[in-house]
């Protein structure tokens, strides 16, 4: 017999709990169980969802898993994997829709909020430049490179070339630490100082360099490096 949601006690069923208390009240594995709908002959859908998350160490790695990696889990077939991937992609698109307008960045918190959900789960370091107009509105965003950050790779020319092309008044640079710890490294500080100096020469101010961790961030401006 395959375990289904209806086999779970009513007061513990994720769907009923969502209806009564809202989706924010559910744990990650409960939301996942609603997508999966059925378990296996050996375990309930809640147990299956919990095992799936444990395999991927939570949402961080599941977010970037391939259909082959997901279907390698016992009890997860193509249909279930497709449902999971579709839900993840919808989440990504909704996150992007939130900022399709001219988002205004007036503080490090504003900048971190703008990129946090896109960058906190990335498995590699991404260095991103955010270009602003004179009203501190975002006019463009560009990934400059992907990989370990060092001063020889992050060339100011690539950062400021786009700023000139977009007639940007200022820029904010952002990169993530896949470890989840946003503590700046010596390389982070060196890159920041180099970009800030180039910005002063060109006349396009580097407002900040943000390091994104897992729901945490560090502003190198607040640390006194910009």
UniProtKB/Swiss-Prot annotation:
* Record motif JAMM motif, residues: 175-188
A GO term, aspect molecular function: metallopeptidase activity
Q: What is this protein called?
A: UPF0758 protein GWCH70_2550
The record's section on Pfam families has:
RadC (PF04002), UPF0758_N (PF20582)
Coiled-coil stretches: none
Q: Locate the MPN domain: which residues?
A: 104-226
Answer whether the UniProt record assigns the keyword Zinc to this protein: yes
Binding residues annotated for Zn(2+), in chain numbering: 175, 177, 188
User: GO annotations under biological process?
Assistant: proteolysis
InterPro entries, per the entry: MPN, RadC_JAB, RuvA_2-like, UPF0758, UPF0758_CS, UPF0758_N
């Amino acid at each position: 017999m395959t375990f289904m949601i209806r086999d779970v006690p009513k007061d513990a069923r994720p769907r009923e709990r969502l209806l009564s208390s809202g989706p924010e009240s559910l744990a990650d594995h409960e939301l996942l169980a609603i997508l999966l709908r059925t378990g296996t002959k050996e375990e309930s859908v809640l147990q299956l969802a919990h095992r799936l998350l444990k395999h991927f160490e939570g949402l961080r790695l599941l977010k970037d898993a391939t259909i082959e990696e997901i279907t390698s889990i016992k009890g997860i077939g193509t249909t279930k994997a497709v449902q999971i991937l579709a839900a993840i992609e919808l989440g990504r698109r909704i996150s992007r829709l939130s900022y399709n307008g001219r988002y205004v960045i007036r503080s490090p918190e504003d900048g971190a909020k703008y990129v946090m959900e896109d960058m906190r789960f990335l498995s590699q370091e991404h260095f991103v430049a955010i270009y602003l107009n004179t009203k501190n509105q975002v006019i463009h965003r560009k990934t400059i490179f992907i990989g370990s950050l060092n001063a020889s790779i992050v060339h100011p020319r690539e950062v400021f070339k786009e700023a000139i092309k977009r007639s940007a008044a200022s820029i904010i640079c952002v990169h993530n630490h896949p470890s989840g710890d946003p503590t700046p490294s010596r390389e982070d500080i060196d890159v920041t100082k180099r970009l800030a100096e180039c910005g002063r020469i060109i006349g396009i101010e580097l407002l900040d360099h943000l390091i994104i961790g897992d729901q945490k961030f560090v502003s190198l401006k607040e640390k006194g490096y910009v």
